[in-house]
């Protein structure tokens, strides 16, 4: 069954906008998956160590027949192809791809939590998501406009021409 999936994209190394575009191009090649929409891009302050570049962020909507862990594996393979190194939590990275929502599913697996944990506190996730689905209700019952109202538009700005 086709599921609508929202994936967060982020990069702060090696030409971040190009990294995100390369990831979107890779989404087009995923089996049983179609890229439906992409939010405007934003620039945001890093969550982790302050001595790193600001991030470029966005959200993509995909329709997929892949199982959640199969999609996660495919996204992590894209990260690796683009030079992702997992050494410092919340450190700089060429590409970060996170499954935010997977249809109406609630998942609490060792490798995957859906809705994505802490998304409600991350402006760089909520605002691009709202660009794609402004009235979205999450599978756990939370309503995106309420999450936005509780998450100030701080440390983030929409990129011109994005």
Swiss-Prot record:
CDD domains to which the protein is assigned, alphabetical: HPPK
Pfam family, one: HPPK
Record's catalysed reaction(s): 6-hydroxymethyl-7,8-dihydropterin + ATP = (7,8-dihydropterin-6-yl)methyl diphosphate + AMP + H(+)
Pathway in which the depicted protein is active: Cofactor biosynthesis; tetrahydrofolate biosynthesis; 2-amino-4-hydroxy-6-hydroxymethyl-7,8-dihydropteridine diphosphate from 7,8-dihydroneopterin triphosphate: step 4/4
Protein name: 2-amino-4-hydroxy-6-hydroxymethyldihydropteridine pyrophosphokinase
GO annotation, biological process: folic acid biosynthetic process; tetrahydrofolate biosynthetic process
EC number(s) recorded for this UniProt protein: 2.7.6.3
Gene Ontology MF term list: 2-amino-4-hydroxy-6-hydroxymethyldihydropteridine diphosphokinase activity; ATP binding; kinase activity
Function: Catalyzes the transfer of pyrophosphate from adenosine triphosphate (ATP) to 6-hydroxymethyl-7,8-dihydropterin, an enzymatic step in folate biosynthesis pathway.
Record-stated family: Belongs to the HPPK family.
Keyword entries, A-Z: ATP-binding, Folate biosynthesis, Kinase, Nucleotide-binding, Transferase
